[in-house]
Amino acid sequence: TEMPKEEAIIQYYIEHPLLITGRKFDIRVYTLITSATPLRIYFHDSGLIRFATHQYDPNADPSDVQTHLTNFALNKDDPNFVRCEDDGTEKVSDSKWSIPFFIEYLKSNSIDPDALFKEIERVVTKALLAGMSTIQSHHTRQVSHRHTSYEQYGLDVILDENFHAYVMEVNVSPGMSGTDSRIDYTIKNRLMHDVL
């Protein structure tokens, strides 16, 4: 077999994802690293739950991105995409949830949110530690004001049906525009305020 000549990303596919209302979802977790040496990582209690807009079907065509992927940019124009109310009121049918809404959903379904978020924190920490030598090396070479700099990360985590967490993507300096909806604005505004 020949290797493709164009750029590609190879990523493990979670075959039995945890579903909510039949939809695949991920959790955007925000972290802040304020020191590479010694390592200092902060987890923010804000974040987003982002849903695929099509019902999950493991046999769906792999090119049906609205079934398999939860990325906002790929789902926002789908007719099934549901924004929260202008006043910020959230509903189960929305395509994005806040962490507090997600926690209430978990509790109402007899799922322990504390245990789940410990699992998420565990895999996020491992992912950041896995890349830390590269981050520390870059930081030492490129950052002249090491004691006054920081880096924000947005990590996308998916859960399987057994509540095991997997980091699917790590984003450096994730988008903070918050212009899509009230939920984005509220979460990202608070996040940026806390960073400063």
Where in this protein do the model-derived segments appear?
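Catalytic core of tubulin tyrosine ligase-like
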Residues: T1-E151, L159-Y166, R182, T186-V195
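Glycine-rich phosphate/pyrophosphate-binding beta-alpha loops
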Residues: N171-T179
